[in-house]
Curated annotation (Swiss-Prot):
Pfam families xrefs: THF_DHG_CYH (PF00763), THF_DHG_CYH_C (PF02882)
Listed name of the protein: Bifunctional protein FolD
Gene3D superfamilies the UniProt entry points to: Leucine Dehydrogenase, chain A, domain 1, NAD(P)-binding Rossmann-like Domain
Protein family: Belongs to the tetrahydrofolate dehydrogenase/cyclohydrolase family.
């Protein structure tokens, strides 16, 4: 039976470090990490995500502000707000909650955020830094950053000699995951929906990362015995056994089968998910440390 990688516990550890290092930063420099969260419209899921991020920021001792714009807000209004936040010295991290209404160009909005305050890690400059191995000076997207901490807890920071397979090529998870694994000296293969003989490729992995958004796509016989399996997927599927109309969350991996084969595995829920918000807090603290000219903490 595989070792369970407890994302909730790891996330608590990261947040605990953020709290401690924030107190040290404030005591030494007087700088309080500041994060601004911007939401456009009233999408219920987005409201829940934003509330949890704001709550966690306050728990960490951050200066946290939330800007709520109506669904009808123009793109220019949003861009003007971002520019004002770019110029606000009390704000070190800016997060625009996605998705945005259809009349707003998300790409343009993201590229308007100052790269130094882009704690989501989506600006072209941060993407480029990560792609050229400048991991220390980049902001890394929060989900793959959290997944890497999970991998490091099992294998250490140097992945030399290990084969990693990332299933999924999204800009948010798949591509940055590839770059992080490569920077840690793993031999990395990126696979996707058009990859030939995907199960055979997955079976070569000492570290298998699933990030495709397909419920339970990765079967137990895709997993190399003893491999570390990181399941990034969060999918809601019908659960008639719980009653009519009920649902449950599953990952991209068939957990029940994969757990029998893997050496270590993340559950869904309670795996990578909690790490995402924790790493957002870590990135915000890092931004404040860079502003203060002090060394950023290691997570």
């Amino acid at each position: 039976m595989a070792q369970l990688i407890d994302g909730k516990k790891l996330a608590e550890d990261v947040v605990s470090t953020v709290k401690t290092e924030t107190e040290k930063l404030v005591a030494a420099t007087g700088i309080v990490p500041g994060i601004a969260v911007v939401i456009v419209g009233e999408d219920p899921a987005s409201q829940v995500y934003v509330a949890s991020k704001s709550k966690k920021a306050k728990e960490c001792g951050f200066h946290s502000v939330q800007h709520d714009l109506p669904e009808t807000a123009s793109e220019q209004e949003l861009l003007d707000l971002i520019e004002s936040l770019n110029n606000d010295p009390a704000i070190h991290g800016i997060l625009v909650q996605l998705p945005l209404p259809k009349h707003i160009d998300s790409g343009r909005v993201i590229q308007t955020i100052s790269p130094d305050k882009d704690v989501d890690g989506f600006h072209f400059i941060n993407v480029g830094k990560l792609g050229t191995g400048e991991v220390e000076t980049a902001f890394v997207p929060c989900t793959p950053a959290g997944a890497m901490i999970m991998i490091e807890r099992i294998h250490g920071r140097d992945l030399s000699g290990l084969n990693a397979v990332v299933i999924g090529r999204s800009n948010i998870v798949g591509k940055p995951m590839f770059n992080l694994l490569l920077a840690a000296n793993a031999t990395v293969t990126v696979a996707h929906s058009r990859t030939k003989d995907l199960p055979a490729i997955a079976r070569t992995a000492d570290i298998l990362v699933a990030a495709v958004g397909r419920p339970q796509m990765v079967k137990g016989d895709w997993v190399k015995p003893g491999a570390t399996v990181i399941d990034v997927g969060i999918n809601r599927i019908p659960a008639p056994e719980r009653g009519e109309g009920r649902t449950r969350l599953v990952g991209d991996v068939d957990f029940v089968e994969a757990e029998k084969v893997a050496g270590a595995i993340t559950p869904v829920p309670g795996g990578v998910g909690p790490m995402t918000i924790a790493m957002l807090m870590a990135n915000t603290l890092t931004a404040a440390c860079r502003t203060a000219g002090v060394k950023k903490p290691v997570f």
